[in-house]
Amino acid sequence: MSSSGSSHPFLLTGFPGLEEAHHWISVFFLFMYISILFGNGTLLLLIKEDHNLHEPMYFFLAMLAATDLGLALTTMPTVLGVLWLDHREIGSAACFSQAYFIHSLSFLESGILLAMAYDRFIAICNPLRYTSVLTNTRVVKIGLGVLMRGFVSVVPPIRPLYFFLYCHSHVLSHAFCLHQDVIKLACADTTFNRLYPAVLVVFIFVLDYLIIFISYVLILKTVLSIASREERAKALITCVSHICCVLVFYVTVIGLSLIHRFGKQVPHIVHLIMSYAYFLFPPLMNPITYSVKTKQIQNAILHLFTTHRIGT
């Protein structure tokens, strides 16, 4: 029996074969969800309250934290509903909207990491022009450009989902909706919907990563030319947090993309693990990495707690 995507709900299975353990698995996801909300929420609060953090680098970091919050809020309530409450049905419109926000926020995060690499490149390779290049107006324009690219680029493959017919099954072997999983259920010509995301992965994820890599090659070249050992170390430290975030994000997202596209022989549980690794690890690790590796963030945390302690 076929039905249009706009009228028929989908059924989410969570972890097929592990239904008896769903409640225990949900405890882990709940802990991770709370940690992501707390970490990124705290980071946003610090950047808002501490005027020393009102700089381009931390503006982009605030965008990164907001994106990670958005990704968690988009996926985790559905995951917990499936695993904890056994609420497996999701309306088609909600499913397609979830797929849209998951993929658009992913491309948005890639753009933010690219903008942060540009910030570090200017700060280290051309420090005398930093304030003239990264003016408030230009930083806002970069931020808006990244937002537009992320949210507009995903519209073409998502919009047709509302009009496709879905036959045989409306079951998704997951706890949330991904475009590549939904499209497999459509009984229509989905060539465009399969090719377009692959092109996006190359021209956004891969290209962004290559530009970031090249920028850090140039940064390293500049750092090695600094005579003072102390200044070299100081310059490198300012990049460590960003490099860690870049590695965590691109390893998980490109790994997930490759498995979905070429991993037909890979066990389904591996697909699930890679999906959850992407949705959990970058949002969890980004605030931790910046809190541990960035002196300004550490000072802001101390200032925040000291101020509140004195106030009480």
UniProtKB/Swiss-Prot annotation:
It comes from Homo sapiens. Keywords: Cell membrane, Disulfide bond, G-protein coupled receptor, Membrane, Olfaction, Receptor, Sensory transduction, Transducer, Transmembrane, Transmembrane helix. This is Olfactory receptor 51B5. CDD domains: 7tmA_OR51-like. The chain crosses the membrane at residues 24-44, 53-73, 98-118, 138-158, 195-215, 236-256, 272-292. GO terms for biological process: sensory perception of smell. GO terms for cellular component: membrane; plasma membrane. PANTHER family: OLFACTORY RECEPTOR 51B5, OLFACTORY RECEPTOR 56B1-RELATED. Disulfide bonds join 95-187. Residues 45-52, 119-137, 216-235, 293-312 are cytoplasmic.
